[in-house]
Amino acid sequence: MESSTTRQGHGEPARTPRGTGPRVRDPLALLTAEFDGVHDVWRSAAGTVCVAGPEPARAVLGNRDGAVAETADFYRTRHGDFGPRAAQIRIGRAGRALIRRHLDARRPELPALVAEHLVPSSVWPDAGNLLVFRHLRDVLLHRGASPQLHATIGQIVHRAVLAGARRRHSPPSRLLFRRRALSVLHAEIRARQREFGSFHEPRDLLDVVVRESEPGSDPKDLAEVYLSFLFAAVGSVGFALGWTVHLLGTHPDRLAMEPSWTVREALRLWPVAWLFARTPSHVQRLGGTEVGPRDRLAVCTYLVHRHPGHWERPDEFVPERWAAPVPDGAYLPFGHGPHTCAGATVTMRLLEDLVGIITRDRWLSVTHDGAGPQVGPALAPPRFTAVLSDRTGCPGRR
């Protein structure tokens, strides 16, 4: 797992820079302050081994030679990784196919959806999450499901998926809601397990999870896998849309650029999945730093995407950089290796469609208070208001 990079200083053990400012609690700000732009791997002041270089990041996430304990981020449950691996693959493949069919069928509805939810103004990042939820709600849960189940899924989105939503409720309230919501989900999963085989095609993603898992799987584990779909589809995709809208609104000279460029550049600057935790399987050297099973590795794709040795103008919004080949090895918005996000392709397509519709025939302006990202397991945009207005006589993007 030794980094193969030969830039000056990379072969030396990393040193944690000593700062004189106040103690930083924000983990993103802490990692950014510690990264010196030279050492790709270092041991942070908190003891975590941080990875910011593309090569060691790919080595860790790709798990070359079994260097780290096998971990599936999407399928991680309270009881460990959901499995077996064959079931993960089946669920991912079937879920991706179902979402793709849904997007193909509902693509013509997107312009009206944008007009209804975002025009003339909208408050983000919630607007992005709720727009995606509205567009995907039938694939998340089929229309024939019980009103109680539909209400529960909607409450989960509002109380747990939206940025900062959990902070708006007290710990006892969150615990009580979690118990009630999981009770409803567990009951539905048990019912679908009993009726397994009575339907030929999956009606929604919950069917996919039940059908493609191993017989006798614990409903509690299946509920967590289903919630991973919900959080990824509504949370991650919504936040990625929010970052793209925020950047375009604050860089109006970039509005006419190709949606594929702006989406990719937004995910470079602000990768929603920004931090991946891993545990070394044995003592080894990673980028000049000795690590072992007692260490916690933190692969920070935010820093990989802004690495000054691999990107020109790394901290600037430059969508046009995607008009030419880019250093793919330093671009990991969906992770890397065997557990790369299975829905990356369909996610990018939906984002590009939405950004194209938002910007094609409208002016976009954004007002915000200058706050930074909302940092958590996902990297969410700050709160801002987006205003869309028609371009009089605009011929549209060609």
Stretches with model-predicted labels:
Residues 346-379:
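Cytochrome P450 heme-binding "Cys pocket" and the immediately downstream C-terminal segment
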Residues 65, 300-325:
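Conserved cytochrome P450 K-helix/beta-meander segment immediately N-terminal to the heme-binding cysteine loop
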Residues 136, 205-266, 351:
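Central I-helix of cytochrome P450 enzymes
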Residues 17-35, 256-289:
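Conserved cytochrome P450 K-helix E-x-x-R motif and the immediately C-terminal K′/meander segment
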Residues 4-27, 47, 54-191, 392-398:
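Cytochrome P450 catalytic-domain helical core, especially the substrate-recognition surface
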